[in-house]
Swiss-Prot record:
Its cofactor is pyridoxal 5'-phosphate. It comes from the Bacteria. It comes from Bacteroides fragilis (strain YCH46). Pathway: Amino-acid biosynthesis; L-histidine biosynthesis; L-histidine from 5-phospho-alpha-D-ribose 1-diphosphate: step 7/9. GO terms for biological process: L-histidine biosynthetic process. This is Histidinol-phosphate aminotransferase. It is an enzyme of class 2 (transferase).
């Protein structure tokens, strides 16, 4: 791996970050706060939140078994994705490599930041070859993006191939584990210390059921986290989000119950889809969704819209011709979907 300084944009490495009032004083002893030009009325919402989310990171570290210094929190995982481009990629000069198909925001952030985005097509089984991915990289490749379980395909990428990429690549490997809670494959979090060039992304939007609060997590070396904290907006995670996330962590048993139920419902839906005559293939999934190839994705999608049921038409995505992506819902929602599909002509 190149040194962190070699990977970081020179201007970012030299950057002196903005220091907010709450950065300069974060103690608990004071009772009068006249430092941040806040309105003294409308407690507690008149106060700026902790810019480093210390209480939340402490609670999160207990669940994830990762020290707070190795945790970055952002306004959704998309903030972390955008920040790694801004921190490590020189616009108009550097490039990144990613599997295809995968989560679309990697390319959007690359385009926004004027960074070349190189795609390597997955195999027909939606797996990838580390050698093929590495062959596309060159001396200007700063990052490789992997998503496992992958979106929209739903499958876990082969762990051996992921490890090979991490070990053999000189730059940063961003591993998006947004759907890992629904997989039987263990997270790479327990191996974070082994891989100084690894950044793991997770989210509160899926298993935690908190998409509305917009909270994403990045786990990495203390040095990488320091770079991300240097360039983030001062109060990027609001106080209401921090409070709600802490509440969810205090009832983690509930999240585990949801995950168990959703995995059972995924099996129910997959079995039901296999029986539908116009379903050509149901792809194995380790996420809270699955991909199904049908005879006419556009026609079936439009039919479901007419029935008040929305799935995702992935027909235009690489390797996903005539495919629908179906999110696992409650038993009542899933039964309504299957009932509507059984009536489809």
């Amino acid at each position: 791996m190149k040194t962190l300084q070699e990977l970081t944009r020179p201007n970012i490495w030299r950057l002196k970050p903005y220091s907010s009032a709450r950065d300069e004083y974060s103690g608990a002893a004071a009772s009068v706060f006249l430092d941040a030009n806040e309105n003294p009325y409308n407690l507690p919402h008149n106060r700026y939140p902790d810019p480093m989310q210390r209480d939340l990171k402490l609670e999160l570290s207990k669940i994830k078994k990762v020290a707070p210094a190795h945790i970055f929190l952002g306004n959704g995982s998309d903030e972390a994705i955008d920040l790694v481009f801004r921190a490590f990629c020189e616009p108009g000069r550097d490039n990144v490599v990613a599997i295809d198909p995968t989560y679309g925001m990697y390319q959007v952030c690359a385009d926004v930041n004027d960074v070349e985005y190189r795609k390597v097509l997955l195999h027909d089984d939606f797996q990838f070859s580390a050698d093929e991915l590495l062959a596309v990289a060159d001396e200007r490749t700063k990052m490789i993006f992997l998503c496992s379980p992958n979106n929209p395909t739903g499958n876990d990428l082969l762990r051996s191939e992921i490890i090979k990429v991490i070990n053999d690549f000189e730059g940063l490997v961003i591993l998006d584990e947004a759907y890992n809670d629904f997989s039987d494959e263990p997270s790479f979090l327990s191996e974070l210390d082994k891989y100084p060039n690894l950044i793991i992304l997770q989210t509160f939007s899926k298993a935690f059921g908190c998409a509305a609060i917009r909270l994403g997590m990045a786990f990495a070396s203390e040095g990488i986290i320091g770079v991300l904290n240097k360039i983030k907006y001062p109060y990027n995670v609001n106080q209401l989000t921090q409070q709600q996330a802490i509440e969810m962590l205090h009832k983690y048993y509930e999240i585990e119950r949801w995950v168990k139920t959703l995995k059972e419902e995924r099996g129910y839906l997959e079995e039901a889809f296999v029986e539908l005559p116009w379903v050509l293939q149901v792809f194995p999934s380790n996420a809270n969704f699955f991909l199904a190839r049908v005879t006419d994705a556009v026609k079936i999608y439009n039919y479901l819209v007419g029935e008040g049921i929305i799935v995702r038409n992935r027909n235009s995505i690489s390797l996903c011709g005539n495919c629908l992506r179906v999110t696992v819902g409650t038993r009542a929602e899933n039964a309504k979907l299957i009932g509507a599909l059984k009536k489809y002509q």
